[in-house]
Design a protein with these regions (language model features):
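Glycine/charged-rich beta-loop-alpha catalytic/anionic-binding loops adjacent to active sites
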Residues: 2, 21-34, 83-90, 139-140, ...
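Short beta-strand segments
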Residues: 4, 35, 60-66, 107, ...
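Short, well-ordered, mixed-charge alpha-helical segments that flank or form enzyme active sites
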Residues: 9-12, 40-43, 68-73, 127-130
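Short coil/turn connectors at secondary-structure junctions
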Residues: 26-30, 54-60, 92-93, 101-102, ...
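Condensing-enzyme catalytic core mediating Claisen C-C bond formation in acyl metabolism
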Residues: 81-154, 158
Length: 239
């Protein structure tokens, strides 16, 4: 059991520990938190997939729950300050795109679940020299939205190229795009940069906002519910 949530009720114990107890899982079930901002859910899928492939576990569950209420209320109160500078207003504005939601997924071996959709793995790159562009606490998130968009798209392009090479993706390989979503500008520019058809991407940012690590699994679930994902389709999970 891996919890990938950004939000948490306590520093200790881990949120995974609480979920494990609430579900009354077997004491032998390994449980831990994994934090990596909006990428954590997909990272956790890689970890579970790798452990299954190595024969260390038979199956694993990933959970994520995000609540934006506390930081949104704190930000709105801060932005009411008449002494707030224009720069301070702008660096707080991205916080207002945050949403709330939760998701979970279970991964198992193809031997035990021969008819289930297959997770094929992926690719990852880091540009940690830009890690100061978005700094968040329970009370405040400070974001340089312009630079974050520029450097984020740059990294996305590099990572997509690596994934395409590793997984054999061509321009029309993917039937559905499951995107981590922040805004219309971000979604449109990402698809334009990668040469992807925006009609293949179900948009949830108008109603859900940026739900952090839960965004990708929520989009995937809603795409399946809407009949956009059918047996045999190739689906790209882009964090």
């Amino acid at each position: 059991l891996i919890n990938s949530s950004v939000c948490r009720d306590y520093i200790e114990p881990s949120t995974a520990c609480i979920v494990h107890g609430n579900l009354q899982l077997d004491p032998r079930c390994l449980n831990f938190d994994m934090g990596n901002a909006c990428l954590a859910f997909i990272n956790a899928m890689d970890v579970v997939s790798g452990m299954i492939g190595q024969g260390r576990i038979k199956m694993g569950m990933i959970v994520d729950g995000e609540s934006s209420r506390h930081v949104l209320n704190a930000t709105l109160n801060r932005m009411k300050d008449p002494n707030l500078t224009d720069a301070e207003f702008r660096e707080n504005f991205a916080t207002l795109t945050l949403g709330s939601g939760s998701a979970a997924i279970i991964l198992g071996s193809t031997r035990d679940f021969p008819d289930a959709p297959r997770y094929r793995g992926g690719a990852h790159l880091a540009a940690t020299q830009h890690s100061q562009l978005c700094l968040g606490t329970e009370e405040k998130m400070k974001t340089d939205t312009k630079k974050l968009l520029i450097h984020g798209l740059e990294l996305a392009g590099q990572t997509y190229a690596k994934a395409s090479e590793a997984l054999g993706w061509g321009p029309n390989t993917l039937d559905e795009l499951v995107l981590h979503q922040v805004s219309k500008v971000h979604t449109d520019q990402l698809c334009n940069l990668l040469g992807l058809d925006t009609e293949k991407a179900l948009k949830i940012y108008p109603t859900h906002g940026n739900v952090g690590p839960a965004s990708v699994p929520i989009v995937l679930s809603k795409a399946v519910e809407a009949g956009r994902v059918q047996k045999g389709h190739r689906v790209g999970l882009l964090g």
